[in-house]
Amino acid sequence: MRFLFLHPNFPAQFWKISQALAANPRNEIVFLTAREDGSIAGVRKVLYKTAREVAAQTHPYLKTYEQAILHGQAAYRAMLEEKKRGFYPDVIYGHSGWGTTLFLRDLFPRARFLVNFEWFYNARGADSDFDPEDLPTADDEARLRIRNSSILVDLYSCDAGSCPTKWQHRQFPSEFHSKIEVLHEGIDTAYFKPAEPDAPLVLGKNGLNLSELPEIVTYATRGMEPYRGFPQFIEAVHRLLAARPNCHVVIAGEDRVAYGAALPDGKTYKQELLARFPLDPKRVHFTGLLPYADYLRLLQASHAHVYLTRPFVLSWSVLEAMSAGCLVVASRTAPVEEVLEHEHNGLLVDFFDVEALTATMNRALDERSALTGLREKARQTIQVHYELRDCLKRRVAWMNRQMK
């Protein structure tokens, strides 16, 4: 069979499924993307480039929609050339929201059209109005409604959709629920596993030897931002280090905003927070983005791993931490509660309660031996519900059903 995957950021959510399908020599796998670097054995990349940037005069509500249309237009043009060369997919599987999915149904009308749906924007009841000090304005509400435009086109156009979690599935309009199946991408538990006894845990990127640190709190994020509880975490770390002279904190991620709004004065949240809550650079280690092997060592060395999120998309990182046997201290928010139960396989705190977060990190460090069972149950949760092999089987079976 011929499969066409669509995502501007290769390989993104389609890494493992495209890799698995490419292992079958009877399949032909094409991946349309805007990202030049990276490769997967047996997967042929086709590149596209948008014709221009979003116009400065475009109405603010329409900027994300215009951006999606530009991606969709470029995707169509790139695949038109492939069609002229004889490529016609049996299955198209794209990620909604970016725009690459918008027009290819028209170019390949006989193909089964599958879409991965990650998030539907709502001004009420999820992330947007979660912070009482940062409620959406009328402009925000209007912008969010229009931001769903390209997603709604995909919901209408697709033959079937997938969504990684039940929480994320609930964000979509109820009339489309039957069209979307909950299918997580899966976690490689054979890779994300606890360290062997006495294994050296050195971050190759900067030579930091985690094996030598007596107490380690870890935090991993794409961006240092309010959506992932970075302000609460830094304030809690400020308090924690004052009480624990032997504690070290290792923070992986970039000093940028991945989700939500940046500060209006041009400062990063890291800059602002470190000015308010100074931290000892000898005990707080900002590693930047880590290579996969170093990221695994970070999780394996952790004595307490903190994951905070607004009611938004659930990060792979918390599932990877659970698979690696981390003692996870996380926010008591809906996406987290789908995978973590307080005192069963992790410890939950109120997202905004810095005092409770500090106390829970203290407890995690004080009671490391007593809380070993939570680590074991966290890994078991991933093995039972999110094991990569099982998730791939379910996804392939779902894709096969769409061909009937």
Task: Label each residue range with its predicted role.
Residues W167, G186:
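Carbohydrate-associated surface elements
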Residues M1-R44:
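N-terminal subdomain of nucleotide-sugar transferases
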Residues H342-E343, L347-V354, R363-R368:
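Conserved acidic donor-binding segment of nucleotide-sugar-dependent glycosyltransferases
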Residues S162, L203-R228, I234-R239, V249-V250:
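Conserved donor-binding/catalytic core segment of Leloir-type glycosyltransferases
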Residues D159, R297-V313, C326:
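Acidic donor-binding loop of glycosyltransferase active sites
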Residues R52-L62, R110-S149, A190-L201, S211-E212, ...:
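Acceptor-binding helix/loop patch of EC 2.4 sugar-transfer enzymes
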Residues R256-V257, A262-L289, A293:
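Nucleotide-activated donor-binding/catalytic signature segment of Leloir-type glycosyltransferases, i.e.
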Residues A356, R363, A370-H385, C391-A397:
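A short, well-ordered alpha-helix in the C-terminal region of glycosyltransferases
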